């Protein structure tokens, strides 16, 4: 666990150099999951200096505990976005365990971090949040974008 934090912290300094205002971004971050087994439905991270060749962080093991951040115990389809302030990151993931069936996902998880190491999370279950949407069966691969004109972040899936 300590090695993972050291690797991610080192990467965060490379990736988030703009926080100081003196450095430019110097690496790419790729967030991913690896498969359909429970142990594979978790957020992993890899880093690249050129955008083509990536090295998995944390020995290709999860960097977040899916059991802690999700309602199902598994997460898939991570998408990460650097905020307009250049200092904050948002990640959104599907809250799902594929072993429960492909129509079992009703929620997404919203995550926020200032350092790519420490994350806060909130589960958004669409059917519970919006009672008139009971027929909504899937929240697949949510993504985030920023609308400069509206000055708001949006999630679509």
Briefly describe each language-model feature range.
Residues 1-7:
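Positively charged n-region of N-terminal signal peptides that target proteins for export
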Residues 7-17:
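Sec-dependent N-terminal signal peptides
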Residues 22-157:
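Carbohydrate-active catalytic/glycan-binding domains of CAZyme proteins
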């Amino acid at each position: 666990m300590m090695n993972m934090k050291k690797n991610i912290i080192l990467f965060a300094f490379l990736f988030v150099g703009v926080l100081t205002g003196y450095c430019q971004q110097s690496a790419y971050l790729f967030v991913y999951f690896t498969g359909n087994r429970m142990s594979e439905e978790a957020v992993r991270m890899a880093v690249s200096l050129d955008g083509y060749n990536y090295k998995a962080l944390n020995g290709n093991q999860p960097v977040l505990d899916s059991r802690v951040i999700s309602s199902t115990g598994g997460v898939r389809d991570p998408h990460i976005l650097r905020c307009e302030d250049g200092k904050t990151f948002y990640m959104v993931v599907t809250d799902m365990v594929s072993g429960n069936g492909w129509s079992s996902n009703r929620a997404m998880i919203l995550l926020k971090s200032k350092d790519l190491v420490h994350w806060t999370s909130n589960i958004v279950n669409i059917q519970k949040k919006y009672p008139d949407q009971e027929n909504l069966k899937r929240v697949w691969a949510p993504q985030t974008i920023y609308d400069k004109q509206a000055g708001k972040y949006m999630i679509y899936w």
